[in-house]
Amino acid sequence: MPIPRPLLVLALLLTLAFAARVAHADCIADAADRHGVNGDVLRAIGWQESHLQPAAVGHNANGTLDLGAFQINSIHLPELARHGIGATALADGCVSAEVAAWHYRRQVDRWGNTWAAAGAYHSRTHALAAGYANRIAAILMRWKLMPPGPPPFAATEAQAPDPPRQPPPFTGAYEVLPFVPTAR
């Protein structure tokens, strides 16, 4: 008995959706590896920012835009432009993951491999960064990639991280990569 056409179409769409999700996940893991950051934290950042929607655009009260799956703020566009990345390129999930890994690496270099660095991906204001880090930790706990426990920052914690170190310049590593992710 032949399989009904609507069922075949549904199966094909589900297969393509799964393949796209796996490819996108590989972009995240590859970018994290290249920049030496935690891939699970990077993926959780993308989930927090846009649920990994590549074409996401956020409008901020200060007039800036957050672009792509990792919501890269438009204040970074002049520096990214020096490396050939424009606003529209950030709608490519792999480019967005690469830029996010670079930005997160800058925070790790500044604050150390800490929750303060994860929070600083979002904001340099300690209270906002602490809340963001707690949300990233909650995502990792939900995904069972981190044991359940109290949030990294208590609600009343007011101490700031150590003074910042100078972040490294963008390496432009994406330029030598094809935008077709490799299978793991």
Summary of predicted features, one role per range:
Residues 1-26, 30, 34-35, 138-184:
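N-terminal secretory targeting signals
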Residues 23-156:
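Catalytic glycan-binding domains that act on GlcNAc-containing polysaccharides
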